[in-house]
Amino acid sequence: MGNKPTIAISHLGCEKNRIDSEHMLGLLAEAGYQIDGNEELADYVIVNTCSFIQEARQESVRTLVELAEANKKIIISGCMAQHFQEELLEELPEAVAIVGTGDYQTIVDVVQRVENGERVKAISTTPTFIADESIPRYRTTTEGVAYLRVAEGCDYRCAFCIIPHLRGNQRSRSIESIVTEAQQLADQGVQELILISQITTNYGLDLYGEPKLAELLRELGKVDIPWVRIHYAYPTGLTSPIIAAIRETPNVLPYLDLPLQHSHPQILKTMNRPWQGQVNDSIIERIKEAIPEAVLRTTFIVGFPGETEEHFDHLVNFVQRHEFDHVGVFTFSAEEETPAYQMSPQVPPDIAQERRNLLMEVQQPISIKKNQNCIGQTVPVLIEQENPQTGQLIGRSPRFAPEVDGLVYVQGEAPLNTIVPVQITHADVYDLYGKTNLKNDTAFGETLN
């Protein structure tokens, strides 16, 4: 039997998609396939697509068309495959297989069938699979960072969101399964673990009958990983036990990613998030009171159907009042198969874009003030890269999550994928700058200061 084909992957979309990519690569590598980082040289290219909003679909389509024009054999996976399976197979004869969001664990069988001349469609109507610690992973992040999925799918039905249609209802892994994988990652030298799902604060509700994030955090506190970061915390799910677990578990960073989406009760009601409008202020105040050093990231949608200037002004005042550390702003994207697609009045795209730009301008002085407060402090920094031309080190402090927040640019020497003390010397809107301070090298996995 000849050599097995080489396979490359083009990863698009979110961290959840990244984990799917890593599991597919892990399964293929385990089965003896060679993983090639060069798409031009690989026999097959898996394109793990995103379909969350129009912009993401356009990026996925561009990637697919470029590969098709290069006459590559394409395996399409991910959310766009789940969403537009028939259209993709019809429009792209170069697509030799299409794999749904609940079927990526079959990738070895898919490739084998393709090798035998079959054009494969492996898509479950309702995704139900979630990978556990027994499914191999070929990690694509830097050595010191790993994402850890605690649950898949979503039981909520926000009016703008197509995710439940693409990834199914929530299904949680057991605490034991998650902790076992965390230990595996610790053994690989991971310094930062990022917990993800659609709604991390709802973790365990489907499996145990009640949310179990607080218990999970305390168990992860026993694993030798210096930083544990929480993403996708639904604001109304931040209960007192969860806040206490964050405060009392040394390796859990006081960093919360809270996708609030809006502040005005009427818009939140239209978004089908009505309960949130009554608790936004109180939740944020409660977090800051319980965890004064908390770093808060949030995202907002502007231009949602029916959003008036009054609604937008409410959001601007909300951002000014609470002074979030990091803010992301998206313009509304009308997605078919969501209630918001048919809602009226739709906000003109130019007005939505203008509101986005204005809200980002409002946030900028807040962001730079937060960063300038770090000047003079010695903070822990996870060193992830080195500029080969200048020798400058690049990393992140606990204030910064990968890809969405800023970076710390460091003068001095330190090994990659280690956490070292860095004295911050100056700051700009998004990033910090400093120099290594290796005389002060204790307990930096435990605090933000």
Swiss-Prot record:
Its main location: cytoplasm. The keyword ATP-binding does not apply. One of its GO terms (biological process) is tRNA modification. Its EC number is 2.8.4.4. One of its GO terms (molecular function) is metal ion binding. [4Fe-4S] cluster 1 binds at C14, C50, C79. Belongs to the methylthiotransferase family. RimO subfamily. HAMAP family: MTTase_RimO (MF_01865). This is Ribosomal protein uS12 methylthiotransferase RimO. The lineage of its organism: Bacteria, Bacillati, Cyanobacteriota, Cyanophyceae, Oscillatoriophycideae.
